[in-house]
Amino acid sequence: MNTANVKAGETVMVVGVGGIGINAVQGARLAGAKNIIAIDPLENKREKAMELGATHSFASTDEAMETLTDMTRGQMADSAILTPGLMTSEIVAGGFNAVGKGGVVVLTGLNKLEEQNIELPGSIMTLFRKSLKGSLFGDCNPTVDIPRILGLYQSGDIKLDEIITRTYTLDQVNEGYDDLLAGKNVRGVVIHSHD
Ligand SMILES: NC(=O)c1ccc[n+]([C@@H]2O[C@H](COP(=O)([O-])OP(=O)(O)OC[C@H]3O[C@@H](n4cnc5c(N)ncnc54)[C@H](O)[C@@H]3O)[C@@H](O)[C@H]2O)c1
């Protein structure tokens, strides 16, 4: 909603449907996007995305290109929000190719700090007026956005309980990391016991 500035009727691609990406899907839906294409190699992630507002889902950006081209009559996506576990130059290029004229590619996923993971044709970027933007914590302003998000949760417009695949005690935290790496969880949550 904030970094890609999604508007009603737009086409948004979300690449990587984990704890972050599932909420990019929900944000795109709330902002009124017409087409929300969720990309994830794992079927459980794609299913959750479809449940929470995605209109289409594919295992890779490449597989989405034909449908994306058809549904937008070649204009392509207005934005691509990249939320994979590990950002690679292939994923950045996939998002760059998926957006059309004036399209915005949002980089949320991370990699090693020194990793060179952006390799793009600059002339196409200029001629198509595409832009690439980094986003930290959804570019939110906690003072106003956290109460707003809580209100949207209370009214049922943002689903938070539904995205929790499993909860863990603090003692089970390593199991939680194993499940995260194995792709089992859309969102795993550690519950601190107070007794
Ligand atoms: N910018 C920020 O403010 C911010 C904040 C927190 C986390 N992060 C970063 O965001 C990223 C996502 O975090 P998360 O907690 O959602 O992780 P996660 O592991 O829950 O989700 C990542 C998802 O990406 C999918 N994926 C892996 N390779 C893919 C590919 N080639 N194409 C499409 N999908 C692919 C995985 O299957 C998984 O569903 C991480 O890199 C994390 O470090 C950024």
Please tell me what each predicted stretch does.
Residues 1-62, 66:
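Mid-domain Rossmann-like dinucleotide-binding core that forms the NAD(H)/NADP(H) cofactor-binding site
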Residues 3-8, 47-131:
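Glycine-rich cofactor phosphate-binding loops and adjacent beta1-alpha1 units
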Residues 13, 37, 104-106, 133:
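Structural detector of well-ordered beta-strand residues that form the stable sheet scaffold
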Residues 24, 45, 91, 121, ...:
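Hydrophobic alpha-helical segments typical of transmembrane helices
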Residues 42, 111, 138:
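Residues in the short beta-alpha loop(s) of Rossmann-like NAD(P)-binding domains
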Residues 57, 132-134, 163, 167:
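Conserved beta-strand scaffold positions in the cores of enzyme catalytic domains, especially
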Residues 63, 79, 93-97, 101, ...:
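C-terminal hydrophobic helical "lid"/dimerization subdomain
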